[in-house]
């Protein structure tokens, strides 16, 4: 009985509390409503609609053409990514075959100006958002292989008015049911060309002969937007600020001096003609009317903060292409050795990633078609072998320290000569062959070889100290 009463009047356990959590960024208030007003729920392709990409391309090209920082940024990316051009290294077991293919590919690349065209494609990808190149036959190529790269601007790859109703195409690119590109619709003339007429017939290029590169920032994106998109307003702000500072300085400099008086109206000061101008001469004494003072205009412009503002804007611009202020501006005056190397490491890491993209999407496809044409031209039935691509190496900030570190890695077997040469964009086999030729010639000419090991005498049995053999 007592237990029943105890259970009846015991303290009940309160119900569990439900935690109500939310994301602050998902809330809309009067303070942030205007900031998030332009946020949308469009798909990747609709967000990058043809009209949007056309506007972005025009503004990006305008800014690159009129802004030295934007122009330098685009050229810097092309020069650092492509450089003097990639170099082929074959990995088959036949060294003679490797040398022959590498030499022939180099001759063909020089004939078609491959490095220059790749740099143009890199600039177009940054400025226009995407680049196109057709693998076509050019009978004027001075090489047994008549393959050529014909560059096409993004404006020419365009769909007709029915592409919105066709779920298998996106603005000039047709896809199969698995999402693979099948066909590219290329206009005969650029839409801004004098020969262009709306409704002209377009050229359809099979996907296997078309190179299309762009940065896919969202799944489902099939056409690229300029890499400078996020920085375009910043470039405009920087140019406007520079013009404002210059205008203020010019306005203040236009007036060498002004006359003003503290006397009241109709006071004792001499009368002067308002807005009258007086020519001034250098190193001359000047008298002013009684009651008047001479002064100069103060521009009231924060010129002292101008350089800091430019640095902040350029630092923000640099991040859209994964670089830093020092690299973009070419100004390392505030850096020491360590910070300068750190800046370059961040930038060169992105260059390595981008080069991997170029190898997969561009170079391997070019080599595949070239090798097929090469075997047909030389009447050789050879299967495609494994290969690598060498790029230009990055210049060292301190060559002496870099060479010392390289020597230590080779001495303790934590690296290989092939890996070290690859960092400089060189083939270790070519380096060794060239060094062997140089050593042979130096011995023939009687020139001492630097770093040659000295012959060491065996340790004598009588316990005396061994004598060093003197070089002749």
Give short role names for the model-derived ranges.
Residues 185-190, 325-326, 426-433:
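Short amphipathic alpha-helical segments with coiled-coil-like heptad repeat character
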Residues 179, 317, 420:
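Acidic/polar, glycine-anchored loop/turn motif associated with catalytic or activation segments
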Residues 88, 92-103, 286-401:
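Surface-exposed loop-to-helix/strand elements on domain peripheries
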Residues 1-86, 468-472:
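N-terminal-proximal low-complexity accessory segments that begin disordered
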Residues 121-122, 136, 248-254, 328-332, ...:
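Short coil/turn segments at secondary-structure boundaries
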Residues 209-342, 387, 458-462:
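Extended, charged amphipathic alpha-helical segments
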Residues 2-12, 341-342, 361-371, 375-389, ...:
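C-terminal anchoring/interaction modules
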Residues 61-216, 409:
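Structured, mid-chain assembly/scaffold modules that mediate subunit interfaces
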């Amino acid at each position: 009985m007592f237990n029943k009463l105890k259970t009846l009047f015991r303290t009940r356990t309160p119900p569990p509390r439900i935690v109500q959590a939310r994301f602050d960024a998902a809330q809309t208030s009067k303070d942030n409503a205007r900031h998030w007003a332009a946020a949308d729920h469009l798909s990747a392709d609709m967000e990058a609609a043809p009209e949007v990409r056309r506007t972005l391309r025009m503004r990006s090209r305008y800014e690159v053409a009129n802004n030295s920082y934007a122009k330098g940024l685009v050229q810097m990316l092309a020069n650092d990514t492509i450089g003097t051009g990639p170099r082929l290294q074959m990995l088959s077991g036949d060294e003679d075959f490797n040398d022959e293919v590498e030499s022939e590919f180099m001759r063909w690349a020089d004939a078609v100006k491959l490095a220059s065209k790749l740099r143009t494609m890199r600039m177009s990808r940054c400025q226009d958002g995407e680049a196109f190149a057709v693998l076509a036959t050019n009978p004027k190529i001075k090489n047994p292989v008549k393959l050529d790269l014909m560059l096409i601007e993004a404006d020419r790859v365009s769909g007709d008015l029915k592409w919105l109703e066709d779920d298998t195409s996106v603005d000039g690119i047709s896809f199969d049911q698995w999402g693979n590109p099948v066909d590219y619709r290329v206009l005969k003339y650029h839409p801004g060309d004098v020969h262009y007429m709306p409704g002209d017939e377009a050229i359809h290029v099979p996907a296997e002969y078309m190179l299309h590169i762009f940065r896919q920032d969202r799944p489902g994106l099939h056409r690229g937007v300029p890499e400078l998109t996020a920085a375009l307003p910043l470039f405009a702000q920087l140019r406007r600020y520079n013009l404002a500072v210059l205008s203020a300085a010019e306005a203040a400099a236009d007036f060498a001096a002004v006359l003003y008086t503290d006397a009241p109206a109709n006071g004792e000061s001499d009368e002067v003609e308002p807005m009258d101008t007086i020519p001034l001469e250098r190193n001359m004494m000047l008298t002013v009317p009684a009651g008047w003072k001479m002064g100069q205009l103060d521009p009231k412009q924060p010129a002292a903060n101008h350089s800091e503002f430019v640095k902040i804007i350029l630092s923000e611009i640099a991040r859209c292409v994964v670089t830093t202020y020092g690299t973009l501006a070419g100004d390392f005056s505030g850096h020491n050795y360590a910070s300068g190397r750190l800046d370059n490491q961040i930038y060169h890491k992105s260059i390595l990633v981008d080069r991997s993209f170029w190898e997969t999407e561009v170079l391997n496809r070019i080599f595949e078609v070239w090798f097929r044409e090469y075997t047909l031209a030389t009447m050789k039935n050879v299967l495609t072998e494994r290969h690598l691509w060498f790029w230009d190496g990055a210049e060292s900030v301190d060559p002496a320290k870099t060479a010392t570190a390289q020597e230590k890695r080779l001495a303790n077997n934590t690296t290989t000569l092939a890996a070290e040469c690859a960092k400089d964009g060189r083939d270790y086999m070519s380096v060794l062959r060239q060094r062997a030729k140089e050593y042979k010639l130096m011995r023939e000419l009687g020139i001492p070889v630097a770093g040659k090991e000295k012959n060491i005498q065996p340790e004598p049995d009588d316990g005396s100290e061994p004598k060093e053999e003197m070089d002749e």
